[in-house]
Amino acid sequence: MRYTRERLLELEDRALAPYAMRASETRGREHPEPESAYRTPFQKDRDRVLHTTAFRRLEYKTQVFVNYEGDYYRTRLTHTLEVAQVARSLARALGLNEDLAEVVAMAHDLGHPPFGHAGERVLAELMEAHGGFDHNKQSLRIVTWLERRYPGFRGLNLTWEVREGIVKHETVYDLPSAEDYEPQLRPTLEAQIVNLADEIAYNAHDLDDGLRSGLLRPGQLAQVEVLRELAAELELDLERLSEFDRRVFIRELLGLMITDVVAATDAVIAAEGIGSLDDVRRFPVPLARYSERLGAQMAELRGFLYANLYRHYHIVRQVAKAKHVLERLFEAYTQMPEMLPPGVQTAAEEEGLFRAVCDYMAGMTDRYALDEYARIFDPYGR
């Protein structure tokens, strides 16, 4: 039996919860185009994101540790893949559209500049008087304008729901700005669970990378209630955590967070009588959530990571280096645009110098930014 697009949509209609986003009900694309024979609209979107230059570049962009620090630390790409996996698990358990959750997860960090959140803060400061910079908006700009792969239009021509999910991405570190995407309404539940999948992924893998790097000591974990309780349940001695024990611990922490979100979200859906996508959109607060207790524990964990990992002197030095590199590059490009590659110079004529420089720098990998700095400022650079 062949699973055509029509067959896939029919199976989706039967299998999904009444409040899920069905691909058959999408608001469609900005530019009309033929449907795929064997893919739903959201599956087609996922494949388009996967093949972008911006997605490939995530491999060499910082999560916490700069790419050259080691091959085994998470990058922005491995983080994205982990978010997509968690999002699919949450969507499957809640009867939601896995394909929509996956593509929003895959696209949510496309607009991140080099050097992680430090790079974003620097670009936001540099662009404050020139239209600003926000990585969610930059992700949307990439998929609607900067990627050029089709003769009839710029961008990827993704469905409305995927674009909405990108621009309304929201975590404790990301605040959405969705002027053109019904900002008064909540996004789909699929997009909401991506927000939590993002938090779940970085809570677990930043903790893992912090321990692996030695910047966090296993004994410090006892300061955090949820970690202390989990270690007791697993009968692990946090003062003597072996490499194998660490892997078990992180895996169980991931499972704990995912299970809690499924149970808490399902409970509020039932309690509030959510029976349609419209109910999801009009609900005053996000439906996807942790339980109250675990939510408080996750806030404590985030505070612990901020104080002990993100503000560790080793990471602070990386941040200072990133700030210096990006500020000097921005200054050089804007004061002497002739330094820019021809394509960027053309973009500057069309869209303005500062926006073109911002797009160029936001698209850089950590390695490219450092190499570019050396080419411009190292007297022996080539």
What are these regions (language model features)?
Residues 1-80, 84-90, 97-99, 119, ...:
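Histidine-centered, transition-metal-coordinating active-site segments
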Residues 100-129, 135-136:
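Aspartate-rich (DDxxD/NDxxD/DxxxD) Mg2+/diphosphate-binding motifs
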